[in-house]
Amino acid sequence: MTPSQVTFEIRGTLLPGEVFAMCGNCDALGNWSPQNAVPLTESETGESVWKAVIVLSRGMSVKYRYFRGCFLEPKTIGGPCQVIVHKWETHLQPRSITPLENEIIIDDGQFGIHNGVETLDSGWLTCQTEIRLRLHFSEKPPVSITKKKFKKSRFRVKLTLEGLEEDDDDDDKASPTVLHKMSNSLEISLISDNEFKCRHSQPECGYGLQPDRWTEYSIQTMEPDNLELIFDFFEEDLSEHVVQGDVLPGHVGTACLLSSTIAESERSAGILTLPIMSRSSRKTIGKVRVDFIIIKPLPGYSCSMQSSFSKYWKPRIPLDVGHRGAGNSTTTAKLAKVQENTIASLRNAASHGAAFVEFDVHLSKDLVPVVYHDLTCCLTMKRKYEADPVELFEIPVKELTFDQLQLLKLSHVTALKTKDQKQCMAEEENSFSENQPFPSLKMVLESLPENVGFNIEIKWICQHRDGVWDGNLSTYFDMNAFLDIILKTVLENSGKRRIVFSSFDADICTMVRQKQNKYPILFLTQGKSDIYPELMDLRSRTTPIAMSFAQFENILGINAHTEDLLRNPSYVQEAKDKGLVIFCWGDDTNDPENRRKLKEFGVNGLIYDRIYDWMPEQPNIFQVEQLERLKRELPELKNCLCPTVSHFIPPSFCMESKIHVDANGIDNVENA
């Protein structure tokens, strides 16, 4: 191919240590891999113009995006460059060029703006680790000072971040490793019902702790076990005993945390209690409870910059989402006719026009992602002597291997209450039946047509405000390892399917957002409810604070409880005004009159049972949209009345007509 020398130009400002870079769909631009991206250099004019000269094949169409980030020294000599993405362009259609001359200059204007539209998104964890430290009143006040004079005091907290100095004695020794050069970053966030604030700096005396506010410190670092974190505590109400003219008025004491303490715990999440030392005497005067999570990059998987739907939602009429497939078959007033969360149930909902099917995923003992709603199930046990041939024994799903889940006679925990052992013994399908419970996530991804979207709820143990845990499970998998397995299964087997994650656990939502850049997640919340017990996590207690959390984490939106939305219809518009997508769930959604109201409110998706009761067998909205596009593009199809594309158009016809139609009905990215 004849070469063409292309000079790309972009305008924008950078933070210290950052560069602009570009990534695209050819070898010269890294094939959408940020690790192989091309950095730009600043123009000699000094007008915030950045350039890169790249040789491309003349006449070949090239697609590309710009991003802002850091290029780090390799971990090992001769190793691959490590790249951290801070902000990147996520327009549905990337920039494109088809060079037709020997030399060409492309002025791409302002970073983030393409075709007059600004679309930028935050990056994900590529090689760095993120530490989150939180102070909140979910269970009890985070700060406790024993001195009487502080008994009724309110406190302000300031966090200082420092790297520990390392011994340089071995610097002259031959070593294959090279020190990374990344400055640690600190972001402070305040989340409440009314608002969220994100700051990269703090007042001299920090921010005040409030019962209705979640305070969070986010630290990104390449050395998660080599940080010193210092909490300084100040009395918020400065009374007469405070010495006037003090350099730090109201300073009460200090607590120190070495990040190696967290690393040595080998946990992704937990709570640490640190002693607070008096400013003057250096004696212990109290303690602080620090809630933490550690977020690690997804191992063994490199995220592509080809496309991202993390914050994308195409405006459409409200979508019908099949709850657990064809519906709840265990605990609701009117049970579904097909067993929930089975391939048969999911297929049933899909055949009746469901745009998405919702189902629950967690792990078996041998770490296979399985589809099942509850954290526990009932194992059928045969007694040795008694006349009653079987007994039901409740056991956590995580204590059974995938093979055991397929082969053992298991039933839903409701069988313990009904004592209906005949019902639990009724189904004797073999392990390959689509009616079999506990299908693997991989089986589900491979079995259902790609034109039906998946709303994958990631199960995790939740604690109620009264201290009770879901399924009586106070311990569970390591959160990073748990999510790594589920996310890799989805990313490697999803094809072109539309996928939306969701979870009741706020930290799961945070991790899913930070570990990958492709699929969106919704924060599931029950808000104020008369049906379900209040959750311990402050971020889960009201729909408004759930919205603030979603904004802070920059996730797609929330999945709110219908009970709360019917009581407070204004929440729907409030979410939309904040740029959030809003789904709804709950038994109240099964009522067609409630669904009519919710659609009038403007929700984006409704999750409900027994779609087959309300909709005939029919193509879903994505198939209908695909058919309409084909009719517009192919005159031969304009008068066709057939409801599905596959009935009247062979793949060879699409190929001859140069129309690409993928399995999920997207003939180009604009139609996602």
Curated annotation (Swiss-Prot):
Where in the cell does this protein reside? Cytoplasm, Cytosol
InterPro entries, alphabetically? Carb-bd-like_fold, CBM20, CBM20_GPCPD1, GDPD, GP_PDE_dom, Ig-like_fold, PLC-like_Pdiesterase_TIM-brl
Ranges where the GP-PDE domain occurs: 318-618
| Annotated organism of origin | Rattus norvegicus (Rat)
Protein name as annotated? Glycerophosphocholine phosphodiesterase GPCPD1
Which residues does this entry mark as bearing Phosphoserine? 175
Give an example GO biological process.
skeletal muscle tissue development
Keyword terms, alphabetized: Cytoplasm, Hydrolase, Phosphoprotein
Q: What class of enzyme is it?
A: hydrolase
Q: Does the keyword Nuclease apply?
A: no
Give the record's family classification. Belongs to the glycerophosphoryl diester phosphodiesterase family.
Q: What is the lineage of its organism?
A: Eukaryota, Metazoa, Chordata, Craniata, Vertebrata
Q: What is its EC number?
A: 3.1.4.2
